[in-house]
Every structure is written in structure tokens, then in C-alpha cells.
């Protein structure tokens, strides 16, 4: 299997595919017609080459994927707004008047920051607090770190299971599998057509979900080694080490994606 460098994600009723600075989004509209949008995005690691250094680039690559993903998702959502939702409220009109063309970028930034804070709280700090309850009966730091890691993975799995029960999310997950099929079709040297895509696997090594799982596993190794005396230092370490863990995880996933 040949590495293609192509990535992507599912959006509302469609998929986004990216190769280098170029990306395209295909969305099936309510009338059944498929709308395609092509665009470019220059990575921050291209603008500032020193950010592309191994173990540093992972964080910025993740940020790039978040930005492109949000742009694609926002565009796909625009086809499914109700007439009532399409009408701007007075507050929305005021925001549009104050910020103008920058409004979409500002709102996207706010959503990304809020999502990041929520993710830290749910997947990094909550497992730490839950495992801390067992501190009196489990004196071993190593066992505590492993327990925290397993709780973190359990919370993530439960979260995925819960959201996948929602019809809209379930359908989006199906498109996520379609994205994997397209990439696998290309990387196996097959012509990109419906028959070959259908026959391709819906699993892929460079999947974003795999990245999150790798982050969680590697975080166990980090927190087994790094010892802190107080709960406050534990909180700080969980937050401060996120870029480091993400950087190591990215290199691992990148290596695995390029080798069978």
C-alpha cells in the first residue's frame, strides 16, 4: 500500500478530502444534488518552517486540521438551515455589523477554544479527579496513573457510544467510513470509482479517532513517569503536557501510516 498523504473528515451529509494545501468538500443537499467546493489552506508549518520540526509539528498539524474541518463543517451545515434559522436575529445583525466579514472567523475561533476547554475538562481532568478518589486505597503512583488512563479511555469510548446513538451523528459516522474507503482505494493503487471504493476497507491507520486513542495510551506512559505531590501540580501537568503528548502521538501515527 502506497502512502498518499491524503486526509479528510466527515461533514453533514458529505465528506471533506485534503491533500497538501488543497481540499474539497462534497455535500449531498436535501434535493439529492451533490454540491462540491474546492479551496486551499496554507498550513502554519509552511508559513513558519521551524514549527514543522518533528515532535513540535504535531500540535500545529492538529490545529490545521481543526481549522479546515470547521470550515468544511460550517459550509456543509449551510445547506440544512431551516427558514426560521436562516433569518438573523437582532443580536446576529449587530454582530454582523460590528465584525463584518471577520464574524465567521471569530465565531469559529470561539467554538474551537470552547471545544478545546471542554475536551480538556472531560478527557484529561475528569479522569484524574475520579482516580484521585481511590488514592487512599491505592498508594502506588504507577497504579494510579494506569487507573487514570483506563478511566480516560473508558470515558472516551462511552462518549463515542452515546453520541453514535443520535441519528444525525450515526449518519455522519457512516460518511466517516466513506472517507476511509476513498483513501484506501487510492492508496491501494485502484481507480477511484464507486465499485472500487465500495470494495475498500472502512478502517484506516491514520484515522483521527486512532490519533485520540494513541494520545490516551501515550499519556499513561507520561504520567507513570512524571510524579507530582499535590492535586494542583497534577492539574497543571495534565494541561501543560498536552502539546508534548500530542506531538509524540502525531509522530507515532505518522510513522505507522507510512509503514505497513
Task: Name these PLM-found stretches.
Residues 91-103, 131-147, 227-236, 256-260:
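Membrane interface segments of multi-pass transport proteins and intramembrane proteases
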Residues 75, 115-139, 215-239, 246, ...:
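Juxtamembrane "helix exit" motif at the C-terminal ends of alpha-helical transmembrane segments
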Residues 1, 5, 10-11, 45-52, ...:
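Cytosolic juxtamembrane amphipathic/interface segments immediately preceding
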Residues 14, 169, 207:
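Residue-level signature of catalytic and energy-coupling elements of molecular machines
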Residues 1-81:
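Divalent-cation
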Residues 50-75, 148-172, 245-258:
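Hydrophobic alpha-helical membrane-embedded segments
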Residues 83-95, 171-197:
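Juxtamembrane inter-helical linkers in multi-pass membrane proteins
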Residues 105-123, 204-215:
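Select subsegments of transmembrane alpha-helices in polytopic membrane proteins
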